[in-house]
Design a protein with these regions (language model features):
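Thiol-based oxidoreductase modules, predominantly thioredoxin-like and allied folds used
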Residues: 56-59, 73, 81-97, 108, ...
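Conserved redox-active cysteine motifs that mediate thiol-disulfide chemistry
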Residues: 61-68
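Non-globular targeting/processing and membrane-anchoring segments
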Residues: 1-52, 75-82, 98-108, 121-187
């Protein structure tokens, strides 16, 4: 996989990215952000992260799936900003990545890529977590895309948060256990 360090350095932090949306889009994102809360155990887990990680989200400010997942990822990142550096790239502006980030043959968002402290690719996840797919399967079939107009139910947000936290923790453990970084940090 090619290096995306240039994209990362030009990507936006959450607040900057949110500001690119319309007032209505911002409202939708904030609804989910307000519902997404880490419990004490989750906060303690994230606070214990020892390796720096970079998370780059290829997103669409207009996208219902992004509305329902990206604020959750922000909640995780802000629980340990010294170790988690989260940035966003707008799909409509950064079309050069479309071919490389296709999922199941389609241009989908969000696509979340995880990098080590020194910019090496570790993992890619997207466009929906397992619990997001389960919730959508219960609600509908067909080609329509969620609009994000109605906020997801609290239990759905909690399940999505747990899915993303599992992925972030998996990558953190990968970084913590890799011989290359253990040697570098002498631990």
């Amino acid at each position: 996989m090619p290096s995306f360090s240039g994209q990362f350095s030009s990507a936006l932090r959450y607040e900057q990215y949110l500001a690119t949306g319309t007032q209505e889009q911002q409202r939708r994102w904030m609804q989910v952000y307000d519902v997404a809360q880490l419990d004490a155990t989750q906060q303690q887990l994230i606070a214990g992260f020892q390796r720096e990680m970079k998370i780059l989200v290829h997103s669409g400010i207009w996208c219902g799936d992004c509305v329902e997942q990206c604020p959750v990822i922000q909640r995780i990142a802000e629980a340990n900003p010294a170790k988690i550096d989260l940035r966003f790239l707008e799909r409509e502006v950064n079309t050069e990545l479309d071919e490389e980030l296709r999922i199941n043959g389609g241009s989908r968002v969000p696509v979340v890529r995880f990098f080590s402290e020194d910019g090496l690719w570790c993992a890619t996840a997207g466009d929906r977590t397992l619990n997001r797919y389960r919730a959508l399967a219960l609600k509908r079939l067909g080609p329509s895309c969620p609009t994000g107009i109605l906020p997801p139910e609290k239990g759905e947000v909690e399940a999505t948060l747990a899915d993303w936290l599992n992925e972030v923790e998996r990558v953190q453990l990968m970084l913590r256990l890799t011989p290359r970084l253990r040697e570098k940090h002498q631990d």
